Amino acid sequence: MKGGCVSQWKAAAGFLFCVMVFASAERPVFTNHFLVELHKGGEDKARQVAAEHGFGVRKLPFAEGLYHFYHNGLAKAKRRRSLHHKQQLERDPRVKMALQQEGFDRKKRGYRDINEIDINMNDPLFTKQWYLINTGQADGTPGLDLNVAEAWELGYTGKGVTIGIMDDGIDYLHPDLASNYNAEASYDFSSNDPYPYPRYTDDWFNSHGTRCAGEVSAAANNNICGVGVAYNSKVAGIRMLDQPFMTDIIEASSISHMPQLIDIYSASWGPTDNGKTVDGPRELTLQAMADGVNKGRGGKGSIYVWASGDGGSYDDCNCDGYASSMWTISINSAINDGRTALYDESCSSTLASTFSNGRKRNPEAGVATTDLYGNCTLRHSGTSAAAPEAAGVFALALEANLGLTWRDMQHLTVLTSKRNQLHDEVHQWRRNGVGLEFNHLFGYGVLDAGAMVKMAKDWKTVPERFHCVGGSVQDPEKIPSTGKLVLTLTTDACEGKENFVRYLEHVQAVITVNATRRGDLNINMTSPMGTKSILLSRRPRDDDSKVGFDKWPFMTTHTWGEDARGTWTLELGFVGSAPQKGVLKEWTLMLHGTQSAPYIDQVVRDYQSKLAMSKKEELEEELDEAVERSLKSILNKN
C-alpha cells in the first residue's frame, strides 16, 4: 500500500490539507455505494433519480450537491453484477458524475482477550475500575489513574455533552447505557437506518462499540456493571465498521454525522496494524474532517479522538493518516503500573495517553465496562479502550466550559497531561525548547481530569491559527547505505506576511522517498530550538521496495509552543545490517500555529503548572522582542 498527497495543496473550509492518494498492487474491490453529483436540482431531484434506478440516497452534509447512493440489492464487492447499475446512472442525463466506491480495510483496535476512596458507587465493577481511581488493584500503582475523582467532586460528570462512538454499533438497550443513549444523534451507516444496534455473532466480535460506549457513558449508582468516565454524558452510536469493506463515503458520512449534536467523536479503529501498511483518510473523509473542525459545534469545531494503534514495536503510528492527523487527538495507553502495553505503537504525533491492559495476566488488570446481551466485562483492552477514556475526560472539560474549541482541547491536553509514574523502557522523557516534557510513546503524559476541568473553567480561546510553508527541498538526494543523509531548511516562518507562524502547534514534514526496503528507513527532524522528533521508526515487517512514501505528511507535536524560525534539520538513514539504497525526492516543511502568544491572557492558579511555566516563557520572549524593537528604533534614528 502506498500513501501520499496529490501535488497541489487544497484549501477546504479555511484549512490547508493534502489530499491523500493510495495505490495498491491488489485488484480494487468495488462496493454497492456510489458518490453521485447531478447537473441541477436539489435533494428532491436526487431522491427521484435514486428511486428510478432502485437506489437509496443520503445527502452528504459536508459537500454541497453530492449524494450517497446505495443499492441494497447489489452483492457487495461484485464488480460485474454492479456494472449494469453503474452504467444506468452514467447514462442518465440528469447525472453529472457517478463514482463507484472502492472498498478498503479498517480494523478495530485492541479486540483482545486478556488473561479506600472518597467517592462511593454501588456499581459492582466500580472498585475494579482502577483507571478511574487506582488504589493498587490488580497489582497496580496507587494514584496512577485519570484523576476523575477530583473532577467529579467539582461537580463535572459530562452533563450536556454528547460523544459519538464510531464503531460496530452499540447495544443501546443495555441497562447501563439506555438512560444515556442519544437516539437523535445516532445512525447505522452499515444498514442505512437510524438503529445502530450491533450484529450479534457467536464469537461476540461486535461487542467493540458497546464496550467503548460503557467506558464513556455508563450510568452511575444503578447497581449495574461499572461507571463511565463522564457518567452523565450522552452517547450516540454511529455504526460503520461491520461490513466487508470500508468506503470513503461511509467514513466521511460517519465523521460528519450530526456535528451540531455530537461534540466528541471517538474512533478505536484505523488501517491494519500489521507493521507494513501506510494508509489514511481519502479525499471525502479529509474534506469531512476539515469541515468538522471548522464548522462543527457551531463553529467551535468537532473534537476527534483516535486510538493511536496496536501494532506494537513493529509499527509506527505516523504511518496511520488518522492518528497522525492534526485534526485528531491521538491517544496511546499505559497499563496499571505505568509500563507500556506490548501492543503500543510510538510516534511523534501522539498527544497524550490513558490506560488499558496488554501485559498482565491478572484478569482484573483489564478495562471494566459494558458488554453485549446486557453483560459486563473486565476484558476490554488495546488502545481501543484508551481512546474512549480520553473522550470521557474531554466531555468533563466541555461541561466545565462549553466554549472550548477543538484547538483549545489540544492545548489543554498538552498543558494538563502529566508524566505521573509512566515508564517507557525504550524512549526517555525529554523537554522541548520551551520546557514542555514529552515522550515518544506517551506524548505529553497521562490525562488528568481534575487538572483539565480546573484549567478549562478559566480558559480563554487561543489566538487564530495560521499555516506557513516553511520551505522545500525538491532535488533528489541519495540516502547512503551506512551513515545518514542530512538536509537543512532555514525558514523565517513567513514572518512579515499575514500567515506568519510564531508559536508552533503542529509541524508536518511532507516527504516523498523510495527505498529498497521501506521498513528499514529511519527519519528524524530537529527544530531550530533543538527538539528532535522521530518521524519514522524501523518497521521490520515492511518489505516494500517499490512504492515508498509519496508526499506523506509525517507529523510531530513535540515542538509545541516553540519558535518556528531558524534552521530545521532532517536526517534519513537505514537501520539494519543489509545493504540498502534510497532516494529522497521531496521534503516540504509545513508549520501550523499562532502569531501571538497563546497563553499570555490565561489565568494561572497553579504556579508550578506547565501553564505557569509556558506563560513566563512567553512573557520573557515578548519582553526580549520589545527591547530588541526599541533598540532597533533608536539605532535607526541615530
Curated annotation (Swiss-Prot):
Subcellular location: Cytoplasmic vesicle, Secretory vesicle; Secreted
PROSITE patterns associated with the record: P_HOMO_B, SUBTILASE, SUBTILASE_ASP, SUBTILASE_HIS, SUBTILASE_SER
Disulfide bonds: 225-376, 317-347, 468-494
Record's catalysed reaction(s): Release of protein hormones and neuropeptides from their precursors, generally by hydrolysis of -Lys-Arg-|- bonds
Pfam families: P_proprotein, Peptidase_S8, S8_pro-domain
SUPFAM superfamilies, alphabetized: Galactose-binding domain-like, Protease propeptides/inhibitors, Subtilisin-like
UniProt domain Peptidase S8: residue ranges: 129-453
Outcome of swapping residue 430 to W: No effect on secretion; no effect on proglucagon processing
Function in brief: Serine endopeptidase which is involved in the processing of hormone and other protein precursors at sites comprised of pairs of basic amino acid residues. Responsible for the release of glucagon from proglucagon in pancreatic A cells.
Protein name: Neuroendocrine convertase 2
UniProt lineage: Eukaryota, Metazoa, Chordata, Craniata, Vertebrata
Gene: PCSK2
